[in-house]
Amino acid sequence: MKIILATSNKHKVLELKEILKDFEIYAFDEVLMPFEIEENGKTFKENALIKARAVFNALDEKQKKDFIALSDDSGICVDVLEGNPGIYSARFSGKGDDKSNRDKLVNEMIKKGFKQSKAHYVAAIAMVGLMGEFSTHGTMHGKVIDTEKGENGFGYDSLFIPKGFDKTLAQLSVDEKNNISHRFKALELAKIILKILNKG
């Protein structure tokens, strides 16, 4: 069984390939011509399913027999911002680049008079194939701070300190991050489903 990842985000592709290294993984653009997918769901799970369905439906009939489309939708929910940016994490600033999104998050927090806040990351994984549709979910709790620290990671990693740590995700090694991340937790559950489907 082959897995096609319903994302063109290079950072996400690397992270997903690392965590799912027991499977034969292909990035979206290795199999299909890239196309835009409108993420108009109201939850992480809905958006993950929208992306996985779109990619699976774009495969030809032979490919559909060989592939499962796997998608991740994830984001950060900040308590003092009433759970925002949430499902809009990737496009929070309106510009779609990580630095602008981080800057907006810090500015919004400071506007409310806070230098840090409790926050949590959420990841929803969706899998779509001829056998049906499946989804899993993972969370990681911690706090966001107003100063970027660390060089690793992407997204909001340089602002987020996981619970039980004194470093941001961007200061942790790839292995340290992958062992605690929301995406890792959701993918560990997804692996169980994928192994069952592979036997079937």
Swiss-Prot record:
Keyword Transmembrane helix applies: no
Pfam families: Ham1p_like
Keyword Hydrolase recorded: yes
Cofactor note: Binds 1 Mg(2+) ion per subunit.
Record-listed E.C. numbers: 3.6.1.66
GO cellular component: cytosol
Ligand binding (substrate): T7, S8, N9, K10, H11, K12, S74, F154, G155, Y156, D157, K177, H182, R183
SUPFAM superfamilies to which the protein is assigned, alphabetical: ITPase-like
Top-level class of the enzyme under EC nomenclature: hydrolase
Role noted for this protein: Pyrophosphatase that catalyzes the hydrolysis of nucleoside triphosphates to their monophosphate derivatives, with a high preference for the non-canonical purine nucleotides XTP (xanthosine triphosphate), dITP (deoxyinosine triphosphate) and ITP. Seems to function as a house-cleaning enzyme that removes non-canonical purine nucleotides from the nucleotide pool, thus preventing their incorporation into DNA/RNA and avoiding chromosomal lesions.
Assembly and oligomerization: Homodimer.
Protein name as catalogued: dITP/XTP pyrophosphatase
Gene source species: Campylobacter jejuni (strain RM1221)
